[in-house]
Amino acid sequence: MSLDISQFPVLAQANTPNELRQLPQALLPQVADELREFLLKSVGISSGHFASGLGTVELTVALHYVYNTPFDRLIWDVGHQAYPHKILTGRRDKMHTIRQKDGLHPFPWREESEYDTFSVGHSGTSISAALAMAIAAEKEQAGRKVVAVIGDGAMTGGMVFEAMNHAGDLHNDMLVVLNDNEMSISENVGALNNHLAQLMSGRFYTTLREGGKKVLKGMPVIKEMAKRTEEHLKGMVVPGTLFEELGFNYIGPIDGHDVDALVETMRNMRNLKGPQVLHIMTKKGRGYEPAEKDPIGWHAVPKFDPSLFKKPATKPGLPTFSQVFGKWLCDIAEQDEKVLAITPAMREGSGMVEFSQRFPKQYFDAAIAEQHAVTLAAGFACEGFKPVVAIYSTFLQRAYDQLIHDVALQQLPVLFAIDRGGIVGADGPTHQGAFDLSFMRCIPNMVIMAPSDENECRQMLYTGYCYDAGPSAVRYPRGSATGAMQVEAMTALPIGKGVIKRVGKRIAILNFGTLLASALTAAESLDATVVDMRFVKPLDVDLVKEMAQTHEVLVTVEENAIMGGAGAGVLEQLQKLRMPKAVLQIGLPDEFIKHGSPEEVTHDLQLDAEGILAQINAYLAQ
């Protein structure tokens, strides 16, 4: 259900940036107010990322007003904050479909709009992409401008500083907008600082500054004195020294909710030479009191009624796998103070809130710095501690070298609790946990476990905790557990051993992970044997051999890419044993999995019970 645009009379006149730029500047505050109200009601209908977008309304209006998008390139980092951008770039009438099957993509996506100049989803990529586009713009000589928008949270990633260091060295024309959305507006944001930013970005100041540099080039002592004087004057009101040292001209901070100040400052900065940083201060959840008070809790929301000023109550139900992990972590920390938990800015999502509160000295949030988080764990292991890295499958990709070089190569006992393994759903291809089994399986010294239910997950986490011969990983999906009876006592499982769950004939289904219930349902119609393999690596070779000897067809089932996954490991072992056998591999196809609800995606990929049965029957009919 789309919103009635007649309720937003000024916004109705700005369905595209070209239309926005036709409006008088005096109307921009009203555009921003109506855009915020539209976003509020739209996300209430569709669900989605919420607080970040409310904080970037004025910024988005100013950017599209000053810059000639899409000719000028605008790159958003991550994209959580880009909903207002989508609304202003011709997608207003489809906002109610965002994150839904066949609807708008959850993040800026090149295939969706010419205004989305770079597809995003993971943090820290915007400045590298913007630098490349700035270099290309200089080669084209067409007058194209390039802007990257990045949040303060993403500034903790090493890739950001690698890009800024390179940009400062090359000195191409580009603007980086640092959206600093801390919980409150900084004290030095206000009329004085806005005026200072406009003054320092103005033509007179910059001409004087650049001309002075040329004059002082032959007088190094006076040049150094002038430089220090300028830095001292700026340093009294601005925290830009770091960016200046990296080769950027720094302007700000200014109030990111003052659309007129943003427009005037950007107009001044638009034609400045070299790399520029505009530091703006915004408030997550701006304009909606519950989100302002709890921006983390309102980061992403289900469908809700904004007029109630609260999210819908969650229905009591099964715990999530993240909660199962969080409880296990607290239980084990009660027994062992050497357990140290590390997460790259995923405390809430990984189920670690209680642990962080109860065991603050054993909890480390490495921020959005996955490479650092993994090597930090390696260092802890060297010193005799028991590090546990809680990380999403899609983000572990970003620390692959550290996993190999710093952990596995040294056979360090680091436990990886890999959340969001398999189909994640609405966040789409940038967040599906499709590849972890494949990219870990080829690493020597790794033990990889895939639990079929919450009790097995708990026991596998304990198994990894006890395993000291090298790194281990337990990967589990997003969402609710299966309802299995949890055994509070923790027992280490025998490494590399699976269990037979159902005895049948002719067909043996070798299941890896939480698709076990669907495999068992499909097996009833086929009278097939079902095995809970438990371990992807080391594989239970004896059990695979037994199944191959006693069945005509083997079927492997996993919620991971078929290429290089657990099923590929079964085929490799059969070849090694010189046992030719008909094997059907069921899993994720060789494509990036689109967004939709987990249930929709699972059904479309034929990974539910009905689909597994259909795939097996089709294979048998060949």
UniProtKB/Swiss-Prot annotation:
One of its GO terms (cellular component) is cytosol. It is an enzyme of class 2 (transferase). Binds 1 Mg(2+) ion per subunit. GO terms for molecular function: 1-deoxy-D-xylulose-5-phosphate synthase activity; magnesium ion binding; thiamine pyrophosphate binding. Its cofactor is Mg(2+); thiamine diphosphate. This is 1-deoxy-D-xylulose-5-phosphate synthase. It catalyses: D-glyceraldehyde 3-phosphate + pyruvate + H(+) = 1-deoxy-D-xylulose 5-phosphate + CO2. Pathway: Metabolic intermediate biosynthesis; 1-deoxy-D-xylulose 5-phosphate biosynthesis; 1-deoxy-D-xylulose 5-phosphate from D-glyceraldehyde 3-phosphate and pyruvate: step 1/1.
